[in-house]
Amino acid sequence: MAETGVDCIALAGDVGDATVCARLVADTITHFGAIDILVNNAGIIRRSPAVDHSEEDWQAIINVNLSSVFRLTQHAGRHMIAKGRGKIINIASLLTFQGGITVPSYAAAKGGVGQLTKAFANEWASKGVNVNAIAPGYFATDNTEALQKNPERSRQILERIPAGRWGEPEDLAGAAVFLASAASNYVHGHILVVDGGWLNR
């Protein structure tokens, strides 16, 4: 991006750590002077039957997938409220609406992301800050690699998707641009599903 002339910085850190979340927001504001758009996109997944799901896996996934959303939104939101505007986009999931199989902590976290989106929106809509979410369906990413490589499971998934294919990252671009732009100024607490029609069935 820097080669195109865009002013940018790359910040790294484990967003499962509360102090890192605070630092990332502070460093961004120090560099740019403001935060206009926050996309909460960090996520991990660990698969195991609920009866075997470890406390370590539970805590790791809740910290990264849910607690970081609260922390980053809170820190960035304080700044946005002070200036009277801002856009926050949380990445939810189909498991915001469904329970899933062998992913209890992931489902719990993504359900929480949906509720946090609405809770923040209820408080901040009148302050000029839009808080919404995108719920991707089955996308061809590292998180779904095990499913893609399982012929039977992949077939079952594709048979249910009316669009007949796995989603690609670029399929999310339109939703993200809409929620980050002035076109969504009257949209608050909405979870925009991008799933090829999965939830219709």
Q: Where do the protein language model's features map onto the residues?
A:
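The beta1-alpha1 cofactor-binding region of Rossmann-like NAD(H)/NADP(H)-dependent oxidoreductases
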Residues: 12-24, 55, 170-171
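Substrate-binding pocket helix/loop in short-chain dehydrogenase/reductase
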Residues: 49-50, 57-62, 157
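Active-site loop-to-helix junction immediately N-terminal to the catalytic Tyr of the SDR YXXXK motif
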Residues: 53, 98-107, 119, 144
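Active-site helix of classical SDR
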Residues: 73, 109, 117
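Alpha-helical segment proximal to the catalytic Tyr-Lys
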Residues: 78, 122-126, 185
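Residue(s) in the substrate-gating loop at a strand-loop-helix junction
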Residues: 93
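Short C-terminal tail/terminal secondary-structure segment
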Residues: 98, 177, 188-201
